[in-house]
């Protein structure tokens, strides 16, 4: 599988920039929601380097971005916001907690929810960055995955690529060894978790 370098940077840089800005300024009215479903939260010893702890998952900050809106969107609480994003052809979601951050793009030419509830599906591109040393955001591993998600079928055409930026050689080897064993499964779990944003939030009212 091949990923264009510029494509990687286009996903990775906004994620890291968002994480950095989030760490120094969080407004009181920022949209916040926890995605702590049983299939996405594991114990710390299962994947200690590449997974967040249940505690950090509970403190995940979520921001929805659509180029047609300048105001803050809150589809979890506002049905009109959910409908607007569901009828759009593209929107982005940024999620961040103490140990990881993610940038996800949802795309469907038919409209997000129409695509999701049909055989067309929704194209999901996700870049999730895991901070190997949480207090040091300069040491990280990023799992970039793409897939087509559908409401009543398993996700299709899943591909992923890992990106490492770890300066400590011993730590880098440990992370790479763990990624070799569990990276594909982690990418699949991330895609399924992003699918719940559609099924539980954006397209929950669509039959």
UniProtKB/Swiss-Prot annotation:
Keyword Signal part of the UniProt annotation: yes
Source species, domain of life: Bacteria
Keywords: Signal
Signal peptide feature range: 1-19
Similarity comment text for this entry: To P.multocida PM1509.
Protein name per Swiss-Prot or TrEMBL: Uncharacterized protein PM0015
Origin species: Pasteurella multocida (strain Pm70)
